[in-house]
């Protein structure tokens, strides 16, 4: 049984409907991501999927080929960014860019002696800070996150059943040192999960940031049903799809500019 806020689900459906589309199904984020990044052997032997996004970290445990436990933690990439902004006294957008470009979840992996330009708040001049200083801010928050995941696994009773270990995915999982720090904390194999996609633009799509989106496509393809109206899904001409997109942007962005 999976529970969630009805109003949140309804808001998502309304957004899709306003774009001229219909919603076939609602899929739990962890299940969608699992379609993109997990192997059937992993699900059978036992694996924990940790999807680290911006606002939340979503956990799913699979054993014997089925999902056994899910949880959502309120700590993720946005909290890391906020820590950087506060500790280094830099704007939030700059903190996000510093995290993505120079961040490391392990201080020991940050190049010693390398300095980075750090914007200041307001009209103050930018400063130069060591990359190790940035890592000093990031590591404690990521460690806290992994310890919370570990506590959730122990509470669920599935920690000892993860035969293939942990799979990290999501946009925030790409941070340098995430896998190394996770292995230190969980004491089991850890890998970065990227979508198993080999089609056009695979060099772009094979990115952990797109795990949920690609997983939704794979879920929909695998669970196609003849009772859904074909004209709306899969066979709509590109001109119709882009036409609806153009109308949506014209309507909503046009209103904002007025």
Description of each model-found segment:
Residues 38-69, 84, 216:
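Gly/Thr-rich phosphate-binding beta-strand-loop-beta motif of the actin/hexokinase/Hsp70
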Residues 4-5, 103-106, 161-185:
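Glycine-rich phosphate-binding loops at beta-strand->alpha-helix junctions
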Residues 26, 69-71, 189-194:
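Short hydrophobic/aromatic-enriched beta-strand-loop microsegments
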Residues 146, 150-164:
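Phosphate/pyrophosphate-binding loops at sites that engage ATP/ADP/AMP, CoA/4′-phosphopantetheine
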Residues 1-49, 77, 88-135, 156-159, ...:
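Nucleotide/phosphate-binding catalytic cleft detector across ATP-hydrolyzing
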Residues 67-79:
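Short glycine-rich, Thr/Ser-proximal phosphate-binding strand/loop in the N-terminal lobe
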Residues 82, 132, 136, 140-147, ...:
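Feature representing long, continuous alpha-helical segments
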Residues 52-60, 183-195:
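Acidic-glycine-rich active-site phosphate/pyrophosphate-binding loop
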């Amino acid at each position: 049984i999976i529970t969630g806020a009805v109003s949140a689900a309804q808001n998502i459906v309304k957004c899709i409907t306003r774009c001229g589309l219909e919603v076939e199904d609602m899929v739990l984020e962890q299940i969608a991501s699992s379609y993109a990044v997990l192997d059937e052997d992993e699900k059978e032997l036992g694996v924990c999927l940790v999807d680290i996004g911006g606002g939340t970290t979503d956990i799913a445990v699979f054993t014997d080929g089925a999902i056994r436990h899910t949880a959502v933690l309120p700590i993720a990439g946005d909290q890391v960014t906020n820590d950087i902004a506060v500790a280094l006294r830099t704007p939030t957008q700059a903190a996000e860019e510093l995290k993505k470009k120079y961040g490391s979840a392990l201080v020991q992996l940050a190049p010693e002696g390398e300095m980075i330009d750090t914007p200041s708040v307001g009209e103050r001049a930018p400063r130069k800070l060591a990359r190790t200083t940035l890592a000093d801010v990031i590591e404690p928050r990521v460690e806290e996150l992994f310890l919370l995941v570990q506590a959730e696994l122990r509470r669920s009773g599935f920690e000892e059943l993860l035969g293939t270990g942990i799979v990290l995915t999501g946009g925030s999982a790409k941070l340098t040192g995430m896998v190394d720090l996770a292995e230190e904390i969980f004491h089991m194999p850890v890998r970065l999960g990227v979508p198993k996609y080999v089609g056009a633009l695979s060099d772009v799509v094979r990115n952990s940031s797109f795990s949920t989106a690609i997983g939704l496509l794979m879920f929909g393809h695998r669970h196609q049903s003849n009772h859904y109206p074909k004209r709306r899904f899969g066979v709509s001409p590109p001109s119709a799809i882009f036409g609806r997109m153009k109308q949506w942007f014209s309507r909503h962005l046009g209103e904002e500019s007025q």
